[in-house]
């Protein structure tokens, strides 16, 4: 039976690696570690074997740690005393990062396979790096540029003039137009970039609304990841910008002229309306909605299902709809609960008096 973690039918495998290589990967000094051992892969605490590395980032799984058979476990220094005999503790102050590094060591991304699939349609004026991969049935438009070591999956549509930087990966069924894509950008299957923004004259004519031409672009900076079935509309007269290092979850909507700073995180089903600007390191949780023309300050956090209708100050946290600062929101919730208890108590007293 195939292992759950790193099933070789789906994931490339490397190794085995000695303990010293694993320690080097996470920046752990090799001195002081137990005897040299070979490790063949990674696995969860519950299923790991003595030849595998596991990890723990949440104390609530400490029972699984005590019972694990893993040969080594990556964990925070404060949890090292829970490691059972026979298991090596690989301590890290950033255990999630360390786990990502070790998992990537054993399961590196597959390299691009240079070449253009015979079923792909590539305009003669497109410039494609010699070591880029163009998948089956993909279409590359006129004057498009595909950078070194890019991997374009099957059934992808790359529009005229689109630029995709080196080492980027575009998943199947993605469409990209009117866009400039940076380096090391990952776009997951089904995403849509560069289509018309939702711009029209709000007063209907006898034949309906008149569309305002959307003359801007989409700019995706370096090291961005865009989730499956997410959408980024091009700007109306300026650019829609996704800042370097940002992450968009699946099913996210970014409207025209929106500008995200560096390392923003937008969680699934969130939507950001036109011309709203996010500073660096902003987090927008799942199903939150932001109206247009807002400014969200650096480091702000938007709670799940929040309805944001006004600007949000830097490093503040808001929840609810309409969104309120977290402390104010829960103060109101507590007040409403007290009022409800008083009302219920009053009903009981009235009923007792009638008896």
What are these regions (language model features)?
Residues 1-119, 184, 190-191, 196-211, ...:
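Terminal amphipathic alpha-helical/low-complexity segments used for targeting or macromolecular assembly
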Residues 55, 115-325:
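Structural signal for interior beta-strand "rungs" in well-ordered beta-sheet cores
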